[in-house]
């Protein structure tokens, strides 16, 4: 990252590989019990969270974290891409233009004009991405979850396939009222 002319720039290397979404679709089509092994999920999202920490340290929010925006390099490293929706956090009130969002990966506050966004908004999306790696498809949209939350039921069915710890991480990330 660097700032120049009141604009934040990010320069990235050229990468070869595929998006996490591509891997999820391929694994889902194979119809295995686990879309991804837990060790793979933990390794990939350790890297995603390290990158997200840097974004947040620069007082920025990504605001469009989803499997299509997580790139897996040929040497199995995870890199966040597509910062087109990224916004600088200007104030605690979240005074900035609200970006478009992706259903299933957008936190509840992205659907409401009167809600503040912050690092928790990106964390919700990380949890939704982990969920997609476990289930093979995205979770229900946040407004549907507010009306009738089936997340816990869906995750309960994964107990024994994935550790209780990983399931609790997803529940924590995707809390409707963090």
Residue ranges and their predicted role:
Residues 160-176:
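Conserved C-terminal C-lobe helix
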Residues 95-110:
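Conserved activation segment of eukaryotic-like protein kinases, specifically the C-terminal portion
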Residues 48-60:
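Protein kinase catalytic-loop region centered on the HRD/HxD motif
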Residues 1:
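Activation-segment/catalytic-loop signature of the eukaryotic protein kinase fold
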Residues 21-36:
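AlphaC helix of the protein kinase catalytic domain
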Residues 5-19, 23:
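Conserved short submotifs of the Hanks-type protein kinase catalytic core
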Residues 44-45:
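Activation segment signature within eukaryotic-like protein kinase domains
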């Amino acid at each position: 990252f660097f700032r120049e002319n009141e604009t934040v720039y990010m320069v990235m290397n050229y990468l070869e590989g595929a998006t996490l979404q591509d891997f999820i679709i391929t694994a889902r089509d194979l119809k295995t019990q686990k879309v991804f092994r837990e060790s793979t999920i933990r390794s990939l999202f350790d890297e995603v969270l390290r990158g997200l920490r840097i974004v947040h340290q620069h007082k920025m929010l990504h605001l469009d974290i989803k499997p299509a925006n997580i790139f897996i390099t040929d040497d199995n490293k995870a890199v966040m891409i597509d910062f087109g929706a990224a916004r600088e956090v200007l104030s605690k009130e979240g005074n900035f233009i609200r970006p478009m969002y992706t259903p299933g990966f957008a936190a509840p506050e992205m659907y409401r004009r009167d809600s503040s966004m912050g690092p928790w908004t990106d964390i919700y999306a990380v949890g939704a991405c982990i969920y997609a790696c476990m289930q093979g498809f995205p979770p229900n949209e946040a407004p549907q979850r507010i009306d009738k939350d089936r997340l816990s039921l869906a995750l309960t069915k994964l107990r024994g396939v994935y550790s209780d710890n990983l399931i609790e991480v997803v529940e924590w990330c995707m809390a409707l009222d963090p």
